[in-house]
Amino acid sequence: MPSPRKTLSIAMIAMNEEANLPRTLESVRWADEIVVVDSGSKDRTIEIAQSFGARTIYHAFGGHGEQKNVALDLCTSDWTLLLDADEVLTLELQDEIRTLLADEPKFDAYWIPRLNLYFGRWIRHGGFYPDHKLRLFRRGAARLSEGVGPHSTPQFGGPRGRLHHNMLHYAYPTMGIYLEHMNRYSSEIARLLHKKGRDSQSLPAFLWNAVLNPTAVFIYNYFLRLGFLDGREGLILHINHSVYIHWKFIKAWRLGQGKE
């Protein structure tokens, strides 16, 4: 006798995401449950989420990992898909997930390839694709590390499967949005580096972390990993990614000097 279809919850966090949310929620409207943990949006985020039948909860922001764990704890379905407000499931990925959950999945957690949009171009080279994310797992099988910055990955100790179709990341439509994110994220990472004593106070550490490392990352990703095949947008992305690395170590160094 075939096993019954597994139910699916969508776990999301949000803050002023009215521009992204309709597109994202439309791609998961078919899920059994949508949970959105909001940290104090001033726009129509809550109204939009509820129009898609989402359960919305306010929780003061305490870090990305902490906030996402709150969302995971509120999910009640057999399986959970952790989704950012600017990510969209392609039709092919939706069908792949539905097919997977219609039977008994072989693994308890699955990687999903993510395709990133940068200034209107889909980035397919330079180490940015396939940008695999561990997002689909049995309820309770994974949690995010807390206090490790904005890019915490769900922690899961067992074998993991891989899905084949893309999740689309509508990341940075404008330079202003990109710079705002990178400024905020680099400050968050810098505070963590400072707490760990990695604030580059010695001259060799400073030169490596703030100068040589960003340069090496650019050369490796842009040339050796073929980032140049993504055109001008790829060049801008890899320059800015190296600048982001520079920023986080400069900010950590400044914190170590008591100047930030």
Could you describe each region identified by the protein language model?
Residues 7-9:
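Cell-envelope/extracellular polymer assembly enzymes that use nucleotide-activated donors
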Residues 22, 43-52, 92-93:
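Acidic helix N-cap motif at the loop->helix transition within catalytic regions
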Residues 46-74:
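Conserved donor nucleotide-binding strand/loop of the catalytic core
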Residues 27, 38-47, 84:
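A conserved acidic beta->alpha catalytic loop
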Residues 30, 52-53, 132, 156:
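Short, structured coil segments at secondary-structure junctions
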Residues 80:
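Short aromatic/hydrophobic "clamp" motif used to bind/position activated sugar donors
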Residues 66-72, 90-259:
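Catalytic-site signature of metal-activated, phosphate-bearing donor transferases
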Residues 12-33:
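Short, well-formed alpha-helical segments that are part of the catalytic scaffolds
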